């Protein structure tokens, strides 16, 4: 919808004169009253300019009489929930048609039929009414393909390996069945941690916890995110970890309190490993293994989710799971089809800054935008360059405190910041629904990293754009990116000569993943001026040394 059309909208006149009085009355009922026209228009304009949908809005065509909250709203909802709807997917043939439609590949033994709607869970799994009510209140009306497959598999107590594109609803796909499994158990308070969700980054853990809070409202479950403060309280016996039913955490922080004997994971029956490819990668694999060794319950059910699952990760998953079912939505290493992808050759490092400024000049730079770089030093340098260009920009990296990072994310989601510069610390999981563009200022070191980075745009069915800059030094690193673009059907963003680049050998792939490319400093200052600045700085330092030597004599 065009905001300028909204602002210039006039009356719509129906020229047909042969309508019955009944039709006329129906038309009159559907139009907003004169008293509500102004409010209706303002609400519509506000909705158009709210990039990230952070504000609550009523439906535009909702009559004003329905805006008032009903006193017995909860009773009405419960009465609706009590009506068991017919199953939308009832047979293997229905499941086959559904999977072909959504390009879902499901393998394993005794695979459950997917659900066709959230209401299907009432008849099939006796879903808790309050959980369903919370979903509807949060406007989660229709399940996504990964949710349709993962929920019945988990509720059938099966281990699960799930791979689906970024922004496809994987978080709810594991939270809904986890909640249902726990609320259906009759256990005493302070029984211990029964649900455990492991995430590679604090930002993703916070996001999972926030969604968990929404859909578990009113169920009396104690849930927590293992923040630095909570870990300190548990370590010093100020808080008992056994009071919590569900815990969300990053691996290392949880290991620290487990080693102290302050957290017992032997009661965990539902284990979720989010962003599994990262948690089984070299940097996290040992930590993940150590946590798994403490989850000793014989009834434990494990599931792992990610947008990319390499074959090595799948092998590790099979070694720790019991007869898992494997669900792949789309392609294992393809990006979402809502993202338009493009590769831009900039020649050298200076060309990248010029390319960004050219995009601004040509009107291609459409906020909100996230820009990814390979290191903290480079992220800081680009931040200072773009601040100099008077762009509304901020930066997030590992050197900033969690509080500072949370504040920047909040401001970005609220639209106060239009361009967010970051490292791979924000590449996974964090949900920014309104991001229009992702720019890979530096080529990511693997196809998986690329898919996760560009997955910050094109989420929840919205369209997005991803632009990747590369130089002569990136001739090898860019090849996996080209493969992802081909698998995603984005060949329009490739030049003909790019498609002819050969494949990497195993040794070359390993080298690209493990060795960052050495790049020049980010700056458009000519080398002559840089040299003069350096000479001047050397002269100043020499002068200081002379003065100090003279004063000591």
Swiss-Prot record:
Pfam families hit by this protein: DEAD, Helicase_C
Predominant subcellular localization, coarse grouping: nucleus
Short sequence motif named Q motif, residue ranges: 120-148
Localization (cell): Nucleus, Nucleolus
Domain of life, per lineage: Eukaryota
GO molecular function: ATP binding; ATP hydrolysis activity; RNA binding; RNA helicase activity
InterPro entries: DDX52/Rok1_DEADc (IPR044764), DEAD/DEAH_box_helicase_dom (IPR011545), DEAD_box_RNA_helicase (IPR050079), Helicase_ATP-bd (IPR014001), Helicase_C-like (IPR001650), P-loop_NTPase (IPR027417), RNA-helicase_DEAD-box_CS (IPR000629)
Binding, ATP: 164-171
Gene Ontology CC entries for this record: cytosol; nucleolus; small-subunit processome
Catalytic activity: ATP + H2O = ADP + phosphate + H(+)
Domain Helicase C-terminal: 338-502
Location of region: Disordered: 528-553
Keyword tags: ATP-binding, Helicase, Hydrolase, Nucleotide-binding, Nucleus, Ribosome biogenesis, RNA-binding, rRNA processing
Single Gene Ontology BP annotation: endonucleolytic cleavage to generate mature 5'-end of SSU-rRNA from (SSU-rRNA, 5.8S rRNA, LSU-rRNA)
EC top class, as a word: hydrolase
EC numbers for this chain: 3.6.4.13
Residue window of motif DEAD box: 274-277
Residue ranges annotated for the Helicase ATP-binding domain, each copy included: 151-327
Subunit structure: Interacts with the U3 snoRNA and is associated with the 90S and 40S pre-ribosomes.
Comment, domains: The Q motif is unique to and characteristic of the DEAD box family of RNA helicases and controls ATP binding and hydrolysis.
Family (UniProt): Belongs to the DEAD box helicase family. DDX52/ROK1 subfamily.
Record function comment: ATP-dependent RNA helicase involved in 40S ribosomal subunit biogenesis. Required for the processing and cleavage of 35S pre-rRNA at sites A0, A1, and A2, leading to mature 18S rRNA.
Protein name in the entry: ATP-dependent RNA helicase ROK1
Gene: ROK1
